[in-house]
Amino acid sequence: MQAIIECLPKERYSHMPHSKKRQALREAAKTLFYTQGFATVSVEAICTAAHTSRVTFYKYYFGKNALVQELFAEQKEQVRNRLECLLAQQCSLEEAAAALFAIQRESMTELYSAPVLDDIANVADLELERFFRSMEEEKYQFMRSFFHTLQQRKLIHHSLPPELIDLFIRQMDSLMRQPCLAELYAPSPQRLPQDILQLLLYGLTSREAE
């Protein structure tokens, strides 16, 4: 199973290697975004953390928004590639569930921290609002196709209408934004998306992904 989950090494996701200075900016930004969210982090703070100049930053990016979009778009493609690889391996439902949980855990520990999720939910910048809305819709379309493929392979019950599965996937994000759940999961906010995914894959049974 692990071989299927890791069927695409992470280093193969990038189209081209980045220069050392650009990679330093990316890593500094990811660290700052993860701990503080991206909304309040300035270009100056990123440059300071990366030990580089603003001139160097603007050599690679028009502004902070461009860097934000690069990091999130890249992570989106990584997830897409891993799931497409998974389907190509003729995975079982258990393997699909294990991969989804593994990808989600990695996303929550590498990029989608609680401050980042809060910034996405309350984004005020119009450019980033359009970007994240577009990403969300792409995610829905891909996951609809992903679960439809599993259904065609008879891993998901054939009687479930695709529209119901699609609506359930969309409701997962709606649940993430419920204030009462945010309060309930405040001690461990990253547990909420895990429990929601668990509910989607296994319902109310006690079964869990290994």
Please provide the spans of the model-predicted regions.
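Hydrophobic/aromatic-rich alpha-helical bundle segments in the mid-to-C-terminal region
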Residues: D119, R153-L197, E208-E210
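Short secondary-structure transition hinges
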Residues: R105-F142, Q152
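Amphipathic, non-transmembrane alpha-helical scaffold segments
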Residues: V68, F72, K76, E129-Y140, ...
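Helix-turn-helix
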Residues: A24, L32-A66, E70
